Amino acid sequence: MNKARAIARWISFLLLIAAGQVCAELQVQISQGVEGAIPVAVVPFANQGSLSDSLSQIVSADLQRSGRFRTLAESAMQERPTAPDQVQQAAWQALGQDFVVVGQIRPSGDGYEADFHVVDVIRGTLVVSYRLPFGRAETRQAAHRIADVIYKAITGEPGAFATRVAYVSVSGEGANRRYNLQVADTDGYNPQSVIVSNEPIMSPAWSPDGTKIAYVSFESRRSAIYVQTLATGERRKVSDAPGINGAPAFSPDGSRLALTLSKDGNPDIYVMNLGSGGLTRITDYSGIDTEPNWSRDGRSIVFTSDRGGKPQLYLVSASGGPAERLTYEGDYNARGVFSPDGRSLAMVHGKGGDYRIAVMDLASRAVRVLTSGPLDESPGFAPNGSMILYAARRGQLAAVSIDGKVRQSLRIEGGAVREPAWSP
């Protein structure tokens, strides 16, 4: 296969970017929650007036947005306790609550401290007490961290409210089209532009410490891979080899980058040492090998290949060698990504022209379809493994729990967003 044909096939294989008019923030909606969601009341924290109200409202919204909780409206609260010993167990039981969150905010140095408590009003026990310092400009982030503490205290699982989401938004038409790589809180607030370009931006990937993003940019009218530091905006071009430069993925320790290059003819998987720039070729196939993703121990790489005739997922050692085919069910399986516990893979699963998000158990190889399609793509796990974020049709993002019981939609008014990536 010549290089021009390889590039054309690769672009048709990967590029699915929709256009639209972009507004400032993602809007998050719960489209389906858990039946029997846990009732919890987040009482407005005492002191500091509007700051306390705002913080409590964000915490309550986070818990409600997870689909795992049903939060009590502030207007339905008959009392406003600020400490555990003020919580009247029977009164909250009468309101149908299982848990009550109370707290106070106090000035501390140049910022504040939030002292909060989670009370189990069914058992009459204190579940957790926590003190969180935060800066004057960090109210939203502090609220997300508080929601994480509450989520873990009640469910036993880590929360993911304080993480962030990267995505590509597209605006304008023709010569006025703009591609914007953005990072926002998981509730859609605080969007920040990483880079804006007249040419496509693709495949954002977080570093394991959450400080950098690797991405593909066509700003020079051909693909190149950059790594950008979010705090400073400093970026480094790490690959602009002839032909395809695509699908970057950081190794678990952040020292290496798996990527797709066609510099030697066809798209194959390579691993780059980010310190030295040295390249190791991992696959050598006459068709297309692309979309690498690392196992959690850094020893293996899952990738998409058409070597069996149609796109399927394969597993190869991170040092190279023979590849093992993982998927057989369906006409199309691509964009494989390991779960945080390493026990399963999320992927795009195609059958009969519909493309849906599915999860495969790596031990049994059983596949469970989680979404309804018909054009779902780009799955990625939340860092706690509870949800999968993906791109759906009509330029919106969506999220589904790994058991399929909780569903969220994330959209921009009148616009399009693609290529989501959840931060560590």
UniProtKB/Swiss-Prot annotation:
Entry keyword Methyltransferase: no
Coiled-coil spans in chain: none
One Pfam family from the record: TolB_N
Single biological process term from Gene Ontology: cell division
Compartments where located: Periplasm
Key words of the record: Cell cycle, Cell division, Periplasm, Signal
GO cellular component, as recorded: periplasmic space
Stored Gene3D superfamilies: TolB, C-terminal domain (2.120.10.30), TolB, N-terminal domain (3.40.50.10070)
Residues of the signal peptide: 1-24
Self-association state and partner proteins as the record states: The Tol-Pal system is composed of five core proteins: the inner membrane proteins TolA, TolQ and TolR, the periplasmic protein TolB and the outer membrane protein Pal. They form a network linking the inner and outer membranes and the peptidoglycan layer.
Function of the molecule: Part of the Tol-Pal system, which plays a role in outer membrane invagination during cell division and is important for maintaining outer membrane integrity.
Family: Belongs to the TolB family.
Name this protein carries in UniProt: Tol-Pal system protein TolB
Organism this protein belongs to: Methylococcus capsulatus (strain ATCC 33009 / NCIMB 11132 / Bath)
